[in-house]
Amino acid sequence: MARPLRIEYPGAVYHVTARGNARQPIFRDEPDRRLFLSTFDHVRARYGWLCHAYCLMTNHYHLLIETTRPTLSRGMRQLNGVYTQAFNRRHRRVGHLFQGRYHAVVVEKEAHLLELCRYVVLNPVRVKACRTAGKWRWSSYRATAGLTPAPPFLRIDWLLGQFGQARRQAQARYRTFVREGLGRHPWQNLRGQIYLGSEDFMARLTTKMERQQEVPRVQRHPVRPRLEDILRSRGDQGIAVAYRRHGYRLREIADHLRVHYATVSRRLRKTEDVRDV
């Protein structure tokens, strides 16, 4: 199982999901769901998370989290670990509850968080578990729409602020917005299965990731062009572009060109004064 996403920085926004092992239920009854939300409340307070939306299904959950500190991986490890232990004690079982680790997509807040908030609370409607989002008790919809008090872990101010300053009017507009959302999917700009955002957002993330050695190279450069396309008919400048701009290693370039990596290194040094690399 691949390591989960390790792109962590203050202000990062994530769509997080985790599924039951072998598609088994991770929530068998209401006490399980309350236990999970209580655990989540403790974790988000400890690690400085803001929750904009959530939905608990039967064999998986969705969370939309904004981190004030770079703590996603530590917090998720605690959330799933503590809940698994409590679930196993309660149901007198042993073994894994979740299918591997969680999955997280880092999200461009301004462009995609609003649509994702709608997508998450419509999940029960899409799978025909209920007819409307308001009929599902275990999501953030009812609290955001003003139908029930908001739990302490849910931050609704940003979301409702997208619909106006007057609270009741914003809630009414939010209800209309969700009602009109069936059939819409927010994943058109998903890149590499772990990024949702524009090219400018990707460029900013790439700059951040260059400073994070723990991020796998394939995640640092999710939208880079193929090596053969970079090197085609570009000579030494192509080598410089592949190495400096797109993060290909000397060994990768050498293997592609079928030369020794020392040859690639020597050709690369010739381009050190090239300004457009």
Predicted feature locations:
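Short Pro-Cys-Gly-centered "Cys-loop" motif that presents a nucleophilic cysteine in a tight turn
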Residues: 1-57, 66-277
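Short acidic-rich active-site patches of cyclic nucleotide enzymes
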Residues: 60
